[in-house]
């Protein structure tokens, strides 16, 4: 559909590849681990049935240097000692890891060709910035409430709906998306990451500020 609509972002090269698998292994249930490595970062957390979910995104140019996923993990991801330990102490539950290529974090339009985009169609946020599914539900909630309000007030028009949705989407998500892109770039630089973590550890309020600007506020209940 994106190709058929000739959306701007689809014309640009996608630079990311994602790899995901479930494992049997130990990891604190109350934590979500984030481990940077050359050209990407990895998230680790416990999910349903006490499974260990390990998912990482890596720049395509870095991935192409290696024969396969196993070599990439051993040569690149294992350079992070914490991540290496997790992999070596875990047992995979998948016959083959799940992969998604051509991932684009380029800016997208929330309204295109008079189509209201929700979820990833309106903008794909970096995984380090929160729950993409929650954002999809939230954007759908915004659309439904705008339509409901306009119909009840007998003020519905396509133009007004499109403008109102674009404005509210920008207010709710635009800053989070931008912050996510900046943080992802920082994670790709080991030196900057190391210095940044030390600063955040020294100033806890800064960490709360980052969380607020990447994860947003709770979805408000319908009035």
Regions found by a protein language model. Give the residues of each.
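Predominantly flavin-linked oxidoreductase catalytic cores and closely associated redox partners
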Residues: 1-86
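Alpha-helical elements of the RecA-like P-loop NTPase motor core of helicases
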Residues: 2-3, 145, 208
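Short capping/connector residues at structural and topological boundaries
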Residues: 10, 28, 39, 52, ...
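Generic structural signal for well-ordered, non-membrane alpha-helical segments
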Residues: 12, 66-70, 108, 114, ...
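Short, well-ordered turn and helix-capping elements at secondary-structure junctions
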Residues: 23, 38, 58-60, 101-104, ...
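FAD-dependent flavoprotein oxygenase/oxidase catalytic domain
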Residues: 58, 81-94, 98-101, 178-198
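FAD/FMN-dependent oxidoreductases across multiple families
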Residues: 64-147, 152
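C-terminal helical "tail/cap" subdomain of flavin- and related membrane-associated enzymes
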Residues: 148-223
């Amino acid at each position: 559909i994106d190709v058929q609509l000739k959306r701007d972002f689809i014309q640009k090269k996608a630079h990311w590849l994602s790899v995901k698998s479930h494992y049997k292994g130990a990891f604190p249930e109350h934590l979500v681990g984030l481990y940077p490595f050359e050209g990407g970062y990895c998230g680790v957390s416990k999910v349903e049935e006490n499974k260990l979910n390990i998912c990482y995104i890596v720049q395509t140019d870095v991935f192409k240097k290696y024969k396969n996923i196993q070599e990439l993990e051993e040569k690149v991801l294992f350079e992070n000692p914490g991540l290496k330990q997790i992999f070596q102490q875990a047992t995979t539950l998948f016959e083959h890891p799940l992969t998604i290529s051509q991932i684009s974090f380029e800016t997208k339009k929330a309204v295109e060709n008079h189509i209201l985009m929700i979820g990833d169609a309106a903008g794909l946020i970096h995984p380090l910035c929160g729950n993409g599914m929650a954002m999809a539900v939230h954007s759908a909630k915004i659309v439904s409430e705008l339509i409901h309000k306009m119909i009840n007030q007998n003020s519905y028009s396509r133009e007004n709906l499109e403008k109102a949705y674009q404005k509210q989407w920008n207010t709710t998500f635009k800053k989070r998306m931008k912050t996510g892109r900046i943080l992802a770039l920082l994670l790709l630089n080991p030196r900057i990451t190391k210095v940044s973590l030390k600063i955040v550890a020294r100033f806890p309020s800064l960490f709360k500020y980052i969380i607020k600007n990447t994860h947003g506020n709770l979805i408000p209940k319908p009035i």
